[in-house]
Amino acid sequence: VTEKSTEVLGRDLGLGLGLRNVHFEHILEHWPAVDWFEAISENFMDSGGRPRDVIRRVAERYPVVLHGVSLSVGSTDPLNLDYLARLKALAAEIQPAWVSDHLCWTGILGQNSHDLLPLPLTEEALDHVAARVDRVQDFLGRRLILENPSSYLTFSHSTVEEPAFLRALAERTGCGLLLDVNNVFVSAFNAGTDPQAYLDDFPFERVVQLHLAGHSHRGTHIIDTHDCPVRAEVWELFARAWEATDGAATLLEWDGDIPNFETCHAELLKARDFMDGPTHAAAPAPLAADGRDAVSTPVDFMIPNAMAAVRGDQT
């Protein structure tokens, strides 16, 4: 297969935050000194009214990136063309710097798990995902950016390491990559592997964006919860990734137990302390298990409310 464009976007976008509804009022009142915002696609593509008005107004003043959680590019179900049409319409209106999602599947037989599930990494899976990425990019009329997921299991029949899989996928399709360094740490801990070895083989030249987030340590495993500050071990990985990507756009995710905007912004700005390379990173603190309830990759906005309504939960 002929290798497609290696053009890399996002090198100079700077430091960004997730656009979360609990911060709408603060953002619209203060227009804070943030370089850019990332919006969860599903939280805005199906909503009119205030959320759509807010993202329009934010997009007039800041670069915005759309980040999806329901493309399910790894599923064996047919691609959801209705979903893609709604995503395309939102992108046409907002004009994001790029559109991203995850190397994962979220459901099968029309049922959505509302989680980002890992794939068996095989040549067959690579062929399958590459064909679907090509279709998505053709449909959207724009390049897709794909993120490495957090994983809580590995497949015994996987034959390709994830960095090599992502490299081959990017070469075949021309898609960009979103390197989530928290996911690297979470997946490596859960699999008993070395996160630095993962980065040794990662195709940094394909990276458009970096993700930072906090996680919940449960003793025997780690859950990607996005509900606390970034751990020292993840900052160490970020320092290396920042240097290796020559300063790719960096985004802090905080989706559960979201503090005020100033706290999130202050956590994001810690990235500046690590931009001179790994030797400047703080020494990692020993991992200690915590007792918090943990939900993997929460989207703390409309999706949980919608699921509660489906279940008939009372508020």
Where are these regions (language model features)?
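Gly/Pro-rich active-site loop or hairpin
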Residues: 46-48, 78, 116-122, 126, ...
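Acidic-and-aromatic substrate-binding clefts and catalytic sites of carbohydrate-active enzymes
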Residues: 24, 41-53, 72-82, 152-159, ...
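Active-site acidic/histidine proton-transfer and metal-coordination neighborhood
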Residues: 80-177
